[in-house]
Amino acid sequence: MTNRPKLIVTAVALLAMSASLAQSERSDVEDPNEALKIAALEALISAPPERALPLVIKVLDANNTDEVKERALFVLSQIDLPEAQARLLEVARSSDPELSAEAVRMIGIGGNPEALAGLGELYSEGDEDLREAVLEAYMIAGDVDAVHAIATNASDADEFGAAVEMLGVMGAVDRLQALSETSGFTEELIQALGIAGGDNVNATLMTIYRDAETDDIRHAALEGMLISGYDEGVLELYKESTDVNEKRDLLQMLAIMDSDAMMEVIDAALEGGDQ
């Protein structure tokens, strides 16, 4: 009897590989032999795992181009065998920075819990590029806990900023709120909230702006509204402000946001009144 869920997953993976291959053929892959190898790898996605694995490993061990090996890593990420996940981690720990980062991302695509757990050590020992790849892998896999842990244990502002930005991309508003309870609403956290967006976030950004004790935090709240597209909030702040300089800044933000209300506000400002 056909395993329908597995068949669907295989079909989706095959379509993803086909799209990637099509892009490759339009740009990087000029050697017909290389294109044929990539096509052969694509076909392996639908092969039995125990038969596909040794062939993929053979490609990785041979003197192939990075393009071919990257395709092999993708196929490897789709093979649900412990040996495949172990090999992905092995490549991720290799000295080749490009293949290492690609292997990390493929671990994210594969979503294997054991392989994902192995990324923690890689993150701790890796350079900035590898750490970025690990964060991307966690994002692809939807591993909010891992990204939150990185933000919590960050050793500097840059590391913290990268982690909270990824939490914003993942829409993890609750984790961002939790971080604010220990670190306060930093500029990085505020901008990450803007990336996450949503009605609750917009209300939080308004509160942060109104309660801000520094211009930097106030500006970060505005940037958060810009990122989330909350021009209604900026317009509300403009209408309630009595400070000319503040109104000017808010008007400029409305212009940047290309708000529908901008022309009405400009007309009122030129008339010397408020809207």
Where are these regions (language model features)?
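Bacterial N-terminal signal peptides that target proteins for export
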Residues: 2-9
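Bacterial N-terminal signal peptides
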Residues: 10-18
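Amphipathic alpha-helical scaffolding segments comprising HEAT/armadillo-like alpha-solenoid repeats
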Residues: 23-28, 49-61, 70, 81-93, ...
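Positions within the helices of HEAT/ARM-like alpha-solenoid repeats
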Residues: 35-37, 67-69, 98-100, 129-131, ...
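Alpha-helical segment of the N-proximal tetratricopeptide repeat
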Residues: 36-49
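Core register positions within helices of long alpha-helical scaffolds
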Residues: 43-46, 75, 106, 137, ...
